[in-house]
Amino acid sequence: MLFSPMKKTFDSIELVVKDIHRGKMVIVVDDADRENEGDLIMAAQSVTPAAVNFMAKFGRGLICVPAAAERLQQLGIDRMVQQNRESFRTDFHVSVDAARSITTGISAADRARTIKIMAEPAAVPDDLVQPGHVFPLRARPGGVLQRAGHTEAAVDLATLAACRPVGILCEIMNDDGTMARLPQLLKFAKKHRLKICTIADLIEHRRTREKLVERVETVKLPTDYGDFDLHLYRSKVDGQHHLALVHGDVAGRGKVLVRVHSECLTGDVFGSRRCDCGSQLHQAMRQVAGAGRGVIVYMRQEGRGIGLAPKIKAYKLQEQGYDTVEANQKLGYEMDLREYGLGAQILVDLGLKTIRLLTNNPKKIVGLEGYGLKIVEQVPIRVKPNPHNERYLKTKRQKMGHLL
């Protein structure tokens, strides 16, 4: 779960932003079910050789420079690889050094100069050389509201502090080389007099001030399971449309039954028996209608986020003996690329606060919390297996942690 219940342990986002604005360093802690790590973070425009040396000496992790996509494009810095297979899809770009006035590029002073250039609005591609000793990271549009990672947190904090949208981060490791976890991070913050916050609190801070989805239209939708209101939403990040089916009065109600369902054309529309998606969708509609009120958020995340064409290619690999996870990995994808931040914002827009979540996937709970939603119960969604999807369901249980 996210660390937000321990708010008294952490500094407010307002205090953290003030320190970033003053050129100071802070510690940002992420989700215990994600990396469960803390990073040193500061605005790139405030970098000094002493700051780089502190990160290298006391942080001990990889010093990286998160930036908005537009900034990296302006500097002519491309992705390191075309197919990102890193565990948390950290978007590494080609490493760089300053083109002039450095030695080997690795010293604290050299790296500080390179980072300074990356934050300069007037900098151009010729001001940098590739490869180098500084590692740029691309932050997702929408920041932590789109992806709850340190990359996005660094850029968001810089932006909130009225700095340029370029940050610096470095993971914090213990003396023995292991990753520092929350107890060690709290001691580290106290020892070095650094503010410490969580990504969950940053999400909450932004969520209460910004919204990345907008409701476009609402229509009546009579179905075999009852009458629903169908709400059309548009993402302000990428223009993608998502849907919310609402049964009954849900705004301001407590413990509303909710299903966040990712699009599956083959299962939802064609009734494919290779998966359980279509059966789960119809069962969710049945349960929501039976409860008297509830919401089904229909997210356009075909094929666990890889898209329709790659999913069909993954099906072909499954016919050759690969399971669903192995097929994704064979194509260069992680086993699950879905994200639930926009789905959470849709639920908040509908007036929900406490929900009963229809899911067999514990990771979905992590993806929704931190956006002002409290999940008071995980409700299993049961559908009967068939001979065509038995192996698929076994893989979901054994490799993806689904509670089946």
Please tell me what each predicted stretch does.
Residues 2-404:
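Catalytic domains of riboflavin
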